[in-house]
């Protein structure tokens, strides 16, 4: 199985046809929908299924201009890092020796190293957080997680916040490893995201099985 084959199969399902009809209709009536159509599946394009080593679960795309480009927590170059990403950078400074805060928020290099940067919902209306919740994306992304759960090789799942932890309930196979904790948003970062050490823990787990660590510096 590959991501393109997975997506093609989902496209045959009634829920998906309703979902895409809804998203296309929203675009057609003139609503601004993020990310742009060509970026909706960026996470799957950038990190092929057979290369996934780590999964990072976000919620829905950023809903401001030029932010979302299909990778959770990531923003296009030239756009200020949103608060959650800024807090991730702060934790990286404390957790990874020598890490310095980048002057951008584009996490594509993480995705290219095998981190699937997966939002639970893949589209959103401009300025309306969670506006496409319950339209069908949750089914799509749960099916993607079930496929990841079925992979024989071990995968590390990083679940920040109650939303991601609930979403990760489908990860049941014993070969996988789960790191969970509070979300990096300003509302919860001080409840245990700061100091969680998840970035170095990911690398410890990868190196323990003979794999290259993630180069977090971007």
Swiss-Prot record:
EC number: 3.2.2.27
Location of the active site: 60 (proton acceptor)
Keyword entries, A-Z: Cytoplasm, DNA damage, DNA repair, Hydrolase
GO molecular function: uracil DNA N-glycosylase activity
CDD domains: UDG-F1-like (cd10027)
Record's function text: Excises uracil residues from the DNA which can arise as a result of misincorporation of dUMP residues by DNA polymerase or due to deamination of cytosine.
Name of the protein in its database record: Uracil-DNA glycosylase
Organism of provenance: Shewanella oneidensis (strain ATCC 700550 / JCM 31522 / CIP 106686 / LMG 19005 / NCIMB 14063 / MR-1)
The encoding gene: ung
């Amino acid at each position: 199985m590959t991501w393109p084959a997975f997506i093609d199969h989902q496209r045959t399902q009634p829920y998906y046809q309703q979902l895409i009809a809804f998203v296309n209709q929203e675009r057609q009536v003139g609503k601004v929908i993020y990310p742009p159509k060509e970026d909706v599946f960026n996470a799957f394009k950038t990190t092929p299924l057979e290369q996934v080593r780590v999964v990072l679960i976000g919620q829905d795309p950023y809903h401001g201009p030029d932010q979302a480009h299909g990778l959770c927590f990531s923003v296009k170059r030239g756009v200020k890092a949103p608060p959650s990403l800024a807090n991730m950078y702060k934790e990286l400074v404390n957790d990874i020796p020598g890490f310095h805060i980048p002057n951008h928020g584009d996490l594509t290099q993480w995705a290219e190293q095998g981190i699937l940067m997966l939002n639970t919902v893949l589209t959103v209306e401009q300025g309306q957080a969670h506006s496409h919740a319950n339209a069908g994306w949750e089914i799509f992304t749960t099916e993607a997680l079930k496929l990841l759960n079925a992979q024989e090789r071990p995968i590390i799942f990083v679940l920040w916040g109650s939303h991601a932890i609930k979403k990760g309930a489908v990860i049941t196979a014993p070969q996988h490893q789960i790191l969970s904790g509070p979300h990096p948003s300003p509302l919860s970062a001080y409840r245990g995201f700061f100091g969680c050490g998840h970035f170095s823990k990911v690398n410890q787990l990868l190196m323990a099985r003979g794999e290259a660590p993630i180069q977090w510096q971007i």
